Amino acid sequence: LDRSAKARRKNNRPESRIRAPRLRAPESSMIPRYSRPEMTSIWEPQTRFKIWFEIEAHAADALAELGVIPKEAAQTIWAKAKDATFNVARIDEIERETKHDVIAFLTHLAEIVGPEARFVHQGMTSSDVLDTCLNVQLVRAADLLISDIDKVLAALKTRAFEHKMTPTIGRSHGIHAEPVTFGLKLAYAYAEFSRARERLVLARKEVATCAISGAVGTFAQIDPRVEEHVANAMGLIPEPISTQVIPRDRHAMYFATLGVIASSVERLATEIRHLQRTEVLEAEEFFSEGQKGSSAMPHKRNPVLSENLTGLSRMVRAYVTPALENVVLWHERDISHSSAERMIGPDATVTLDFALNRLAGLIDKLLIYPENMQKNLDRLGGLVHSQRLLIALTQKGASREDAYRLVQRNAMPVWRGEGDFQSLLKNDADVKKYLSDTEIEEQFDLGYHLKHVDTIFRRVFGAS
């Protein structure tokens, strides 16, 4: 026991511990299966270091114009590093010693630039670089996501007009309600994603700010004109007032917007999943030649893309909570937000980018079955016209309570599969006190429910 205790004490001494190598984690933990290179490239280390350099170099330009540093120094910084490929492994090596990523980068930059590197980062703090870079990346990600939404909108519009007047049953609580058209279902989604696009444009604007204001945001060591120059060069605007960091309520709004968009993705995906159920089969995901639906059941054709989108949407929404909690920082700044942002920035944007592109393709190739829609419309023997009969009876003098009772007592047998709704109504003496056979038949006109589809489409898509 004594020997064992001594061994434990020896192994716990600092000089006896084995230090595990610090490996650079991927900028996005999303697996390649759910990633697209267009978005992941925004978050690659080389991209980040390139942005860091541009921020530092533009700041040096401004300092040179103000006479703070020699103009030749600013020119040398650009000349020696603007086309450089930064050595990620070398930066990691330096960071293992310094325990500071920005210092590690600046040390490596000095190895590239030489003596003039002493004029880099003058009057700045790490967050000036980190926050401005993060916002550049979020803006670029937003631009790509806006383009993704445009693809979804284009697919929805095409299919909506294709099935503008294709009648189908509308459902509330999952139960047959009244007729709609399949085009209207897609128009609903089009309007929702149009709103999503508007919100994302606003969210992009919200994070398109730059802070080059020094250690606590007072510009004590750097002229505010440097911030203005860097902001203009990076496609941003100066943050009106920062502490050591850009306020995180901006980022919270950005990620909350991504979460709402993810919910819109899931809403449409869930609709498709329901419509593909065997008992419904009004629409179906495209099933390619050679595709397999089940390892056990060769007949299966499952809505796997929609189900996949449901899961990815959950992930995007999960990233919203850390963004909201990052708003709360100590005094002029703490670092509690940093670790969360290093994950949620890449992961939320990469995931949503993939989901939107998958959704656009799903809509574009969606198989639609109007004949099954008609079968489902007829399935309840005309019960979907019950509200019109209710209104017709009240207009002929029946109280609403009596009209409701008369329609319901004839509807319930049909609900149980006993008889035809129209025939039962025609044989109900109390109903016949108010409506003739012809008037009853007129209430079963499917076209009546679709008479304002054109109006709705003009509201959603415009006059064209």
Residue ranges and their predicted role:
Residues 69, 74, 280-281, 399:
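Conserved hydrophobic residue
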Residues 50, 139-150, 157, 187-190, ...:
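Short amphipathic alpha-helical segments with heptad-repeat character
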Residues 218, 231, 238-245, 374, ...:
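A structural signal for small-residue-enriched, beta-sheet-centric alpha/beta enzyme cores
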Residues 227-320:
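Acidic, glycine-rich loop-and-beta core segments that form the ion-binding/anion-interacting portion
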Residues 1-26:
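Intrinsic disorder/low-complexity segments
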Residues 184, 252-260, 388-396:
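Short, well-ordered beta-strand elements within core beta-sheets of diverse protein domains
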Residues 29-47, 97, 104, 295-464:
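Catalytic-core signal marking the mid-to-C-terminal active-site face
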Residues 26-219, 223-229, 238, 291-294, ...:
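A helix-coil-helix interface module used to build multimeric assemblies
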